[in-house]
Amino acid sequence: MKYKCIVLDHDDTVVDSSREIHYASFIAYLEDRMPERVKDYTFESFMQKNFHPGVISLFRDELGLSEEEMEREEKYWVEFVETRVPTAYEGIGEIIAEFRARGGIIAVASHSFKRYIERDYEKNRLPAPDIIYGWDIPKENRKPSPWCILDLCERYNLSPSEVLVVDDLKPGFDMARAAGADFAAAGWAYNVPEIESYMRAHSDYYLTSVAELRQLVLE
């Protein structure tokens, strides 16, 4: 195999969480608090605004939410995260299982909490990763810091060139570049031209399907 270790993002790479949780909770909030704005946000437009200028700007500048209202919206999100398990993308479990069966290492580097990542893997019957770097680690070590990859290399006696990062967004790309690892953009979760254009221009690989990830790491 070309790579000895795959570092997987979680949201929109392994599980369809933006569509099923983040966007869904946002729409639920709007339906209750600002129903006239629901029509303004498709899933793709929501993801584009998350990419740029960012979710805080969306809430504060575009929707004009006060700090109190932002806290209220967050409660909707927390309720969805705690009570709903996002669906894993078809074929991702088989890739993880076969890669590990061949001696590969599967790591997760995500801005989700470790307990939710573990739950999602278990409920979707995915093989458990070897190590998880979630939101629980110190702030300075989270993506886009290269710390996760450097720690992996030390733990498993790897060089960065033996590591492939798979992520749908820029923090994962920045982490990979800072550590000297290759980066594959996970382009199967949504169709947002601005994100795709950026990722195609900067990534080592741009993958439009889980099947393409399989070809890259197993064939």
Model-derived features: where do they sit?
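Residue-level marker of regulatory loop/turn positions in helix-turn-helix DNA-binding domains and
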Residues: 88, 109, 141
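Conserved SAM-binding loop
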Residues: 14, 106-109, 165-166, 206
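Residue-level marker of alpha-helix boundaries and capping positions
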Residues: 46, 86, 108, 162-164
